[in-house]
Amino acid sequence: MRRIVCMALALFFLWNFPCGAENYVIVGQMGSEVRYELEQRVTRSPGTQKLVLSFVVPPSFESPTYRQKIHGFDLVFSPQPKDKKRSQDNRGNQIIVATWKPTPPEITARISFKAQNQTRLQQLQTGTPFPLGKVPSDVSPYLSPTKQVQSDDPRIRKLAKELTQDVTTQFDAVQRILTWIVDNLRYVTPPAKYDALYGLEARKGNCQNFSHLSAALMRAVSIPVRIVNGVTLDKPFNVSRKGGVLTFKMGQGRHSWIEVWFGDLGWVPFDPQQTELFVSNRYIRIEIGIDNKETINDGLLRWSQISGSEGKPRLQESISADFASDQVKLSGSRQQYGPRNLLLVPPVQATFTEIKVEPPPPPPVITEPERRKLRYRVPFLFGNLEFPENVDFAFPRGPASTVGTDSFQMTRNFVVETAE
């Protein structure tokens, strides 16, 4: 039982600026030590014969811009399961699976660990050519199309080739694709579907659509991309700039982003909604895979029940994070080239073409007689009209899906981000 609840970004501009490109080069560093705790409480439904919970052990990880070091991981169940196993899947994820049969009325799982997370944004140098050519055998699976990452679809292939025409470096190809994503994909949740093709056709989606479409466009031109699932924390941070401050705040809950493989940098994190070549230290990296249907193991609930039984188990999840230390020193400079929407990137020494963004035309001059005709005299709706209604944010889980005769599963969702 697991469904992803993408976190919405809250961004507050504390100054006025003209319309145009919103590409910011960010330098500096973030360092923190976080005490992380997650609690899941499962209440069985009538007729439940077996309950199975699985979790992924968050790994330590290091890239040129983001580093995560995990200490003291602990997972406690109450009551104790009948069986508990730990294994590693073919992506390297360490998975713990616990089984209860018969099932108690209620099960509690508590995860705790310390995470030392650091984001360092200094000048990167990359000369990886485009096209890449042959990649290592452990990287090649992340070039494959899937049902959620349809990199072999003619429409996706056509757009990817158009965006990367005449490009000679991987950084330039990735930047052009990501620029198109942030300028053309609009955030909504929950979307009708979570795959790349839906995002392309509807031009909207949640974090899964942003991740899947970015991965599909890059894989279509032979750039390896893997999907990352984890958690974002809601502690805000500031980026200073001349004339003001940018304040960023994510919702606290499940999130999906990507990592892109460069020949000279290795795997580097991106959040296709806002950042290139890094994520902030408010991200807890947990599970990787080829798409979000593969990365379902962390927080997955499965059960079997007597034939004809109605109802499903109820699952409540809470996440807390205590920052024992937190140091942030970041500054940003706004560039004169694209995209139009917000994108943050560290300084990069590489060959690339700046994407020019034409400023919008000045608004038309409206005379006072014309203005009187434009005044609204009846109520009207405005704002985010696609914000979901009647969502219980305390129980962020997706609908149950059938996996066999009288057997079901429920995955995490990415709805909590919308609550922010």
Predicted regions and their residues:
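Bacterial N-terminal signal peptides
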Residues: 6-16
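Hydrophobic/aromatic-rich core segments of domains that either
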Residues: 212-312
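Secondary-structure boundary elements
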Residues: 107-206, 213-216, 220-221
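Low-complexity, Gly/Ser/Thr/Pro-rich intrinsically disordered linker/tail segments
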Residues: 281-417
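Intrinsically disordered, low-complexity N-terminal segments that are enriched in acidic
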Residues: 21-121
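A short, structured loop/turn motif at beta-sheet edges
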Residues: 46-48, 102-107, 168, 219-224, ...
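A mature extracytoplasmic/lumenal domain signature
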Residues: 57-59, 113-117, 128, 229-231, ...
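Positively charged n-region of N-terminal signal peptides that target proteins for export
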Residues: 1-4
